[in-house]
Amino acid sequence: MVIGLSHYLTVSAILFTLGVFGIFLNRKNVIVILMSVELILLAVNINMVAFSSFLNDIVGQVFALFILTVAAAEAAIGLAILVVFYRNRGSIAVEDVNMMKG
């Protein structure tokens, strides 16, 4: 059995759906929201690499590496902001984020 493009697209669609459900079903926890966004970005990367391989083009794979780099930076900055917010407020609830106004 050969793993074809449809298998990669199915896995990507499942990951994307899980990410969207994670955002909509759990709006109270910032960490779960960040993890759901990372799942969505991973699904996009799988699509990029699958179509790049299917079309014999390297541009999609290079762009997927760029997206991974930006996603890693986004996760690091988001978690750093979350740690500072927890130290100041003692909670990471989404409802308390509106208190961050300057």
Swiss-Prot record:
GO terms for molecular function: NADH:ubiquinone reductase (non-electrogenic) activity; quinone binding. It is a multi-pass membrane protein. It catalyses: a quinone + NADH + 5 H(+)(in) = a quinol + NAD(+) + 4 H(+)(out). One of its GO terms (biological process) is ATP synthesis coupled electron transport. Its EC number is 7.1.1.-. GO terms for cellular component: NADH dehydrogenase complex; plasma membrane. InterPro entries: NADH_UbQ_OxRdtase_chain4L/K (IPR001133), NUOK/Mnh_C1-like (IPR039428). Keywords: Cell inner membrane, Cell membrane, Membrane, NAD, Quinone, Translocase, Transmembrane, Transmembrane helix, Transport, Ubiquinone. Pfam families: Oxidored_q2. It is an enzyme of class 7 (translocase). The chain crosses the membrane at residues 5-25, 31-51, 65-85. It is found in: Cell inner membrane. NDH-1 shuttles electrons from NADH, via FMN and iron-sulfur (Fe-S) centers, to quinones in the respiratory chain. The immediate electron acceptor for the enzyme in this species is believed to be ubiquinone. Couples the redox reaction to proton translocation (for every two electrons transferred, four hydrogen ions are translocated across the cytoplasmic membrane), and thus conserves the redox energy in a proton gradient. Belongs to the complex I subunit 4L family. NDH-1 is composed of 14 different subunits. Subunits NuoA, H, J, K, L, M, N constitute the membrane sector of the complex. This is NADH-quinone oxidoreductase subunit K. It comes from Rhizobium leguminosarum bv. trifolii (strain WSM2304).
